[in-house]
Amino acid sequence: RYAFTILREQPMWQKLITQSFADEQDALNIVIETINTKINRGENLLSLLKNGFMLQGRRIRLAAFKPKMTLDDDDADHLYKKNIFSVVRQMKYSTQGFDKDNELDLCILLNGLPIITLELKNEATGQTVVNAMHQYQTNRHPQNRMLRTCLVHFAMDNNRVMMTTQLAGDNTRFLPFNKETVNPQVEGDYPTCYMWKRGAAS
């Protein structure tokens, strides 16, 4: 439902429904179908979030970015404040195929659209970031639509963070996302706590 809150904040939305569709659900179905079609054709989610897309001659905006001059653009600032970030734990992302009933440790969504996934490991239980990377490489099908849609995937443990923007099975390439070559120790917290603090601050 979060995916469409921002649509309802746009003046064109009700006009679009009235002029071109039977009801709001009919319009939403076409929006979802259009997003899926564009992703399947290789369009990047970031491009869709930034630019939206045209539907029946009207631009559909899926997200709003912070305007540079809020005093000069009240409408843009209002829409920006209607963005909704949500975090889902142990999210099942597929009901069929290779990924059936698989769960992601964390998924972050913007207006209902998945943008970030995280696989988390605890070194105290014998699992490390290496296990998280292996999980992405061997237990996450790279052609799964939801996974392909996401902008970035993080593998992390108590001390290290690795990231990739494209899953490719065994060929998935991960890059470090640490503060330094080795994350510094943090008194009373884990060395990777910056991931959570940075996210909360954003």
Sequence positions of predicted segments:
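An alpha-helical interface "stripe"
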Residues: 1-202
